[in-house]
């Protein structure tokens, strides 16, 4: 595999260049703005192209070395797209509501994930010993936990990289990433603060077609990273197959 390709035409057709109304802008976005039309800021796609390519490379490199990417997008038009892209690329997501402390208080979140797993086990069977009302309450609790944590249930620990749609809406997620030193890839619209983002992608963060394009490209970059990781593992395994490693590995076990 290779990094996913995209063209300027694709970005234009998806409406990536359309920012917000000029009076809603963040002046820090001035370097990324081409101009305005009918009181709408037009983002400079000649900058978006290389920055998007760089973001895709960061995602692929992170996954290739065994890292985890967390997709974050809780706004209505991003929610389903975010979950689909993360699932398709074997990554993780938050698409309902960002719970304060989701990264910075991982221990508490882990306890909630354990509770979700327990409920999954209980309800996978017949949930014997429970009344109909008790079972209904368990199902409601499970549904609530799954909506909040289902996308990170198997993540294991905090991610190595975060990809964010709408930096204003997900400001708490970005603050937590900063505190933990987790790098952030994010789409920055004309009303955003680019200073908070390690790998910015100037572009529209509201249009469903634009969101779908970003998420598809990021997911494919993650899949490229998985392919590279597996390729590297294949080379290692091949090298080991020719060397007499088995006895060397067994020696410590015998002495233990």
Swiss-Prot record:
From its record, what is one biological process in GO terms?
Answer: translation
PROSITE patterns according to UniProt: RIBOSOMAL_S2_1, RIBOSOMAL_S2_2
Alphabetized InterPro entries for the sequence:
Ribosomal_uS2, Ribosomal_uS2_bac/mit/plastid, Ribosomal_uS2_CS, Ribosomal_uS2_flav_dom_sf
UniProt keywords (A-Z) are: Ribonucleoprotein, Ribosomal protein
Instruction: List the GO molecular function terms.
Output: structural constituent of ribosome
Q: Give an example GO cellular component term for this record.
A: cytosolic small ribosomal subunit
Where does the source fall among the domains of life?
Bacteria
The entry's family comment says:
Belongs to the universal ribosomal protein uS2 family.
PANTHER family registered for this protein in UniProt: 30S RIBOSOMAL PROTEIN S2 PROKARYOTIC AND ORGANELLAR, SMALL RIBOSOMAL SUBUNIT PROTEIN US2M
Quote the protein name from its UniProt record: Small ribosomal subunit protein uS2
> Which species does the entry assign this protein to?
Brucella anthropi (strain ATCC 49188 / DSM 6882 / CCUG 24695 / JCM 21032 / LMG 3331 / NBRC 15819 / NCTC 12168 / Alc 37)
């Amino acid at each position: 595999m290779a990094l996913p390709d995209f063209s300027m035409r694709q970005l234009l057709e998806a409406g990536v260049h359309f920012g917000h109304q000029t009076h809603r802008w963040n002046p820090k976005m001035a370097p990324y703005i081409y101009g305005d039309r009918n009181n709408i800021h037009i983002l400079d796609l000649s900058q978006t192209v290389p920055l998007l390519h760089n973001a895709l490379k960061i995602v692929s490199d992170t996954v290739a070395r065994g890292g985890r990417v967390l997709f974050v997008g809780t706004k209505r038009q991003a929610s389903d797209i975010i979950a689909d892209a993360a699932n398709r690329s074997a990554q993780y997501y938050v698409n309902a509501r960002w719970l304060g402390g989701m990264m910075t208080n991982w221990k508490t979140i882990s306890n909630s994930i354990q509770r979700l797993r327990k409920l999954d086990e209980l309800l996978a069977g017949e949930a014997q010993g429970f009344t109909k009302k008790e079972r209904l309450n368990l199902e409601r609790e499970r549904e609530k936990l799954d909506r909040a944590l289902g996308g990170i249930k198997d993540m294991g620990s905090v991610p190595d990289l975060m990809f964010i749609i709408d930096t204003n809406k997900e400001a708490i997620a970005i603050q937590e990433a900063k505190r933990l030193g987790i790098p952030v890839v994010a789409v920055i619209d004309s009303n955003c603060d680019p200073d908070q983002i390690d790998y910015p992608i100037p572009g529209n963060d509201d249009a469903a077609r634009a969101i779908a394009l970003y998420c598809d490209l990021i997911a494919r970059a993650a899949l490229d990273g998985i392919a590279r990781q597996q390729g590297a593992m294949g080379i290692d395994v091949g090298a080991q197959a020719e060397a007499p490693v088995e006895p060397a590995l067994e020696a410590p076990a015998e002495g233990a």
